[in-house]
Amino acid sequence: MPYFDPTPRIISQSLEELRFIFSWVKDHGETSQDPVTILIGGWAVDAYNPWYGSVDIDLVTNSRTKHSLKYALKNDRGYGTYEMWGESKSVSKQTDDGDIKEIIIDFISRELIKFQGNQTDFDFNIPMEQTAIKEIRGEVLAVVPKRSLLFLMKLKAAWDRTYRIRYNKCHNEDWERGKLVKDYADIIALIDPGHGGAELEIGFLGEKLNDYDFLKKCLENIPENLDAIRKYGRMSQHDVKDTIGQLLSLIG
């Protein structure tokens, strides 16, 4: 399996950072009825199907909250600026966890963001009706995208990562390949019929995958990634292939 194997300890540390973030968000006036900050990525997947968690924390928010929260993280939690793809939109905190040296908090703007290597836009200005309030590990209440939208976001993450690997755009290919395995495993977690996969909205996905037709190929590739299937560990390759085949058939 490509390198990316966090310990339970660093995932627990990440959960503690997540608790701080959403406590800060609540203390600064955000409400679930009018959310500004939305959790995406691996921790959002875990809110629907607790299977692994995450090291990094991915947040969609506005510019004002981003700057204020970054300031609080640097002053109260020991974070520093982290540059990703030449931009300093993220912050990171050093850990003492052997191989994985830091927890990264990535801030995504509420705007149109292109797929890498593609001129198609994905809208990260998430409407309130496409959000849900979920409890993570019985410890953190967070606003997350609805399962179907989160599924599309994870497909976008896998598409972008695959593009970076294929065209040598990544800083650390082994790390990227390991993260791609995690992306695929998260997608499997979202479609697993034994853990809420039936919640996926076929009409919504059909409309969106008509716009993002190229993502269907990304989805079709997942059953061939045995590392991802082993990492998720709750479905066989046959079941993953069958579930994805049924989903694509229903979407049309």
What is each PLM-predicted segment?
Residues 1-252:
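Compositionally biased terminal segments of proteins
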